Regions:
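Acidic-glycine-rich active-site phosphate/pyrophosphate-binding loop
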Residues: 25-33, 85-98, 135-141, 203-211, ...
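Glycine/charged-rich beta-loop-alpha catalytic/anionic-binding loops adjacent to active sites
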Residues: 39-41, 72-76, 95-108, 144-148, ...
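Flexible, glycine-rich active-site loops centered on histidine and acidic residues
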Residues: 126-160
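Claisen-condensing/thiolase-fold acyl-transfer catalytic domains that form or cleave C-C bonds
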Residues: 55-58, 81-82, 100, 109-126, ...
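Conserved beta-ketoacyl condensing-enzyme motif
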Residues: 6, 46-109, 115, 248-264
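Short beta-strand segments
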Residues: 7, 78, 108, 133-139, ...
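Condensing-enzyme catalytic core mediating Claisen C-C bond formation in acyl metabolism
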Residues: 1-47, 149-227, 231, 235, ...
Length: 367
C-alpha cells in the first residue's frame, strides 16, 4: 500500500513580536487577562508578504527532506490571506522556488487549512496521482485586525509552516507497521459560518470595500467558537483514529491547531491525554490559523517531542466552520537531511510602526 510520509518540515516565524505589554498600550487589556484566557504571551508580526513567509518555510522543508524544488509534483498553499486573488499564492510560490514540475493551487479552510491540505496530499499520493507534495500553511493576519478590539487583537499572529509529503511504498515493510498517513477525517458545517467572517476579499463587497473599516476587519465570536471547537476536534480525532484502527491510548503526540490554550487543554482532557502528549507553542506564536500546525510540528521535531515510529495526530477547527484530523505513523527519521539559510529580510521598523496603518484605518469605528 502506498502511504504519504512526512519527510521534510520547516517554518517561518517573523522576527517582529507583538507582546502582551504592547497590547496593554493599544487596547484596554492586561498581560494577566490575555495569558489567562488564551495562553499567549507574544505573537509574530510580518513586515513582508504572505508569499515571502511561505517561501522561507518551504525552503527549510525542502532542505530537511533533502530535495530540490524540481522534485515537487504539487504545491498546496493553505491560506485565507493570499497577497492577491490571482495568480494563486501557490503559483507565486512555485515561481519563487523554481518548482517547474509542480502543479499548484491554493486551499482555504481557515484554521483547518493545513489539515485539509494534508488530507488532499495524502489522498493524491495514495491514488498514485502524485509522489512528492509540498503543503504550506501561511497567514498574514495582522492586516485584518482592529487593534482596538480586544476580542480579536490578542489572539492572532503571522507565520508560515510547511511539510513535504512523499510516497512510501517499500514492499519489504508490512502494511501493519509501515509509516505514513493511517486515517483521516474532514468535515464542515456552514450553519455556524457566521462565527468567524472576513467580509472583504470577496465578490460580495463593493470595489471600495477596503475603504470601509467595518467590512474589512476579521469578525470572531470567541465564546461560540470555543464551544463548537472543543466538541468538534474531539469527535474528529476519534473518527480519524477509528479509521486507522487505533484508539486514544495509541497516540504518542497530538499537534493541534493553536487556537487558544483553553480550547486545546479542554479537548485533550476529554480525550484522556496527558500534557506530554500535546504540543503547544501558542505562547510565543499566537493563533496563526492555517500555519499553526506545521509551525508546531516543526518545533516538536526540534525539541525531540517526536520519536521514530510515533503515532502523531494533527487536528484543527476553523472558520467555515471546518474541522479535520490526520493520524499518521512517523517514519525512522526525525532529523533534517539538510538545512537552509532562507530568512525574511531584516526588519527596519518597530511593531508600533507596522501597526500604525491598521490603527488609523480602523479608528473611525471607535470615535
Amino acid at each position: 500500500m502506498t502511504r504519504a510520509v512526512i519527510t521534510g518540515w520547516g517554518k517561518c516565524r517573523p522576527p517582529l513580536s507583538l507582546t502582551n505589554a504592547d497590547l496593554e498600550r493599544l487596547v484596554e487589556t492586561s498581560d494577566d487577562w490575555i495569558a489567562d484566557r488564551t495562553g499567549i504571551v507574544e505573537r509574530g508580526m510580518c513586515h513582508m508578504e504572505t508569499t515571502d513567509m511561505a517561501e522561507v518555510a518551504a525552503r527549510h522543508a525542502l532542505a530537511a527532506a533533502g530535495l530540490e524544488p524540481t522534485d515537487l509534483d504539487l504545491i498546496i498553499m493553505c491560506t485565507l490571506t493570499p497577497e492577491v486573488s490571482c495568480p494563486s499564492g501557490a503559483c507565486s510560490l512555485q515561481e519563487r522556488l523554481g518548482a517547474v514540475n509542480a502543479a499548484a493551487f491554493d486551499l482555504n479552510a481557515a484554521c483547518s487549512g493545513f489539515v485539509y491540505g494534508s488530507v488532499t496530499a495524502a489522498s493524491m499520493i495514495a491514488a498514485g496521482a502524485k509522489r512528492t507534495v509540498l503543503v504550506v500553511g501561511v497567514e498574514k493576519l495582522h492586516f485584518l485586525i482592529d487593534y482596538r478590539d480586544r476580542n480579536t487583537c490578542v489572539l492572532f499572529g503571522d507565520g508560515a509552516g510547511a511539510a513535504v509529503y512523499q510516497a512510501s511504498d517499500d514492499p519489504d515493510v508490512p502494511d501493519a507497521g509501515a509509516p505514513g498517513v493511517l486515517g483521516t477525517d474532514l468535515g464542515a458545517d456552514g450553519v455556524a459560518g457566521s462565527t468567524m467572517v472576513v467580509p472583504t476579499l470577496g465578490s460580495r463587497g463593493e470595489l471600495s470595500s477596503f475603504r470601509d473599516p467595518e467590512h474589512s476587519r476579521l469578525h470572531f465570536e470567541g465564546q461560540a467558537v470555543f464551544k463548537i471547537a472543543v466538541r468538534g476536534m474531539i469527535d474528529s480525532v476519534c473518527r480519524a483514529l477509528d479509521r486507522a484502527g487505533l484508539t486514544a491510548d495509541d497516540v504518542d503526540l497530538v499537534v493541534p491547531h493553536q487556537a487558544n490554550e483553553r480550547i486545546v487543554r479542554a479537548a485533550a482532557t476529554r480525550l484522556g491525554l496527558t500534557e506530554d502528549q500535546v504540543m503547544l507553542n501558542i505562547a510565543t506564536h499566537g493563533n496563526t490559523s492555517a500555519a499553526s500546525i506545521p509551525m508546531a510540528l516543526n518545533d516538536a521535531l526540534d525539541t525531540a517531542r517526536v520519536r521514530p515510529g510515533d503515532t502523531v495526530v494533527f487536528t484543527a477547527f476553523g472558520g467555515g466552520v471546518t474541522w479535520g484530523s490526520v493520524v499518521l505513523r512517523w517514519g525512522d527519521r526525525v532529523e533534517r537531511l539538510g538545512t537552509s539559510d532562507a530568512a525574511l529580510d531584516p526588519v527596519d521598523m518597530t511593531v508600533d510602526e507596522l501597526l500604525a496603518r491598521n490603527r488609523e484605518f480602523f479608528a473611525p469605528l471607535h470615535d
